[in-house]
Every structure is written in structure tokens, then in C-alpha cells.
From Swiss-Prot:
Organism lineage: Bacteria, Pseudomonadati, Chlorobiota, Chlorobiia, Chlorobiales
Gene behind this protein: thiG
Source organism of this protein record: Chlorobium limicola (strain DSM 245 / NBRC 103803 / 6330)
Protein known as: Thiazole synthase
Entry annotation: catalytic residues: K98
Role noted for this protein: Catalyzes the rearrangement of 1-deoxy-D-xylulose 5-phosphate (DXP) to produce the thiazole phosphate moiety of thiamine. Sulfur is provided by the thiocarboxylate moiety of the carrier protein ThiS. In vitro, sulfur can be provided by H(2)S.
One GO term (biological process): thiamine diphosphate biosynthetic process
Record's keyword terms, sorted: Cytoplasm, Schiff base, Thiamine biosynthesis, Transferase
Amino acid sequence: MDSLHIGSYTFSSRLILGTGKFSSPGVMLEAVKASGAQLVTVALRRFNREQPGDDLFTPLTSIPGITLMPNTSGASTAAEAVQAARIARELSGSPFIKVEIHPNPQHLMPDPIETYEASKILAKEGFLVMPYIPADPVLAKRLEEAGCVSVMPLGSAIGSGQGLATAEMLKIIIRESTIPVIVDAGLRSPSEAALAMEMGCDAVLVNSAVAVAGNPPVMAEAFAEAVAAGRKAFTAGIMEKSGMAVATSPLTSFLGTEA
């Protein structure tokens, strides 16, 4: 089986699903089930068992095969992210943490300096750190060296639906990385997820494109199928582009060349 390996964990699905923006917890749960995702990210504020309306922890962990990846969304500094990660591990018991630090609410770009500092600390504390980062090959390599178990470069701005605007940088990160590269943010359609996988990404994380769809569970299923197809195409070996036409059948001796 062509499995996804992150740290000591193995997943058969290469689609990771976010849980924000859904119209209701019920719709979100149906989408998670339809997606077949095994790794799901949840904001710290959704770990609230005393407020059932805000609690996603209990219903998500009732789905067989689900592993939670808490995230530090809302943190604007490394110190805030580290504190949030420690609380999340205590509440969830999960070793995974998605380090997400975007101090400017206007564009939500991840802060590379604060992200690196937080990731370095958390990796030393035994977390399985998966940082959300700009599509920066140098930063990605530094985070790998700091002990992160994957890097999650953005395709484009969170919730923008602008697709793989960073494709050329993603290709460099994929080529140089020895840990999983997971495209996170900006994907609008299943075809973009398939393209990311064809490029050689190890997985994709999708949230808004599923959450705001007319039928989130069906869209989640479509993304799952696209991710699987893209991965299959990548492993099969995609043909190289050519600057000129290349005949599929030899054109010599067409119906014989005798006079």
C-alpha cells in the first residue's frame, strides 16, 4: 500500500481536512466521514467539553480511525503558539501540532521567524510538529533540520481559492525535502488538489473549499478521489513535456515507399 508516513504514524489517506467554517458541527462531521481523512486539524478553542456547541473533540474522536492534529490558529507570536500547543496536547492527548502563526488578520500570511522559533521549541519537547509556512525552500529546510516531521507550505492565501500560486517554489521544496510536504491553504477545487499530488506533494490539507461548498460531504468525497488520482499519476510516472510534436506512431514507410 502507498501509505503516508508522518513521524511514527502511517495513514492510508493523503487528504487532511480542516474543521473550521462549516455551517454546523453536523455538516462538518459528515464531510469528515465522506472524505475518508484520517488526520484532521482542530483549533484549540474547539476543545471545550463543557460547551457542547464549541466542542469538536468528542464527536471527532468518535469517528473510527481519526487522529487529531490540534493547531495554534490565533497565535501571533512563538510564545503564544508554544503555550497553545502545550494546552492542546494536555486536552487532546495528541502528539501532533500544526504550528500556525499569522499575526496580520488582513492577509493571514504565516510569520516565518515566529514559526521557526516555536517549531524548534516544540520539536525538542517531543511534539510531532507540522508547521504552516510560506512556500520558502530555505525555511522548509531549516524546519526539517529543527526536527519537524513535515512542512506545510501554502498554495496561496488562506481561504482565497487562488490555487497553486506558489507552484514553482513548491517544486523546489518537494525536490529538497526528506520529510513529507503537505500543501496547505488556497486550494479551491479537486483538480488543484490532484495537480499538487501530481507535482509530488505527499498530501494536501483542505478546509474552506469543502466547508463553503454547496454540498460539503460530496465535495469532500471529490477531493479524496482527486488526491488519490493525483498520487496514482505521480507514482505511475507522468510524461515529460516536449517543445515540439512527437508522433505516437512511426511515419516512415507509410503504406510502403516503393515506386
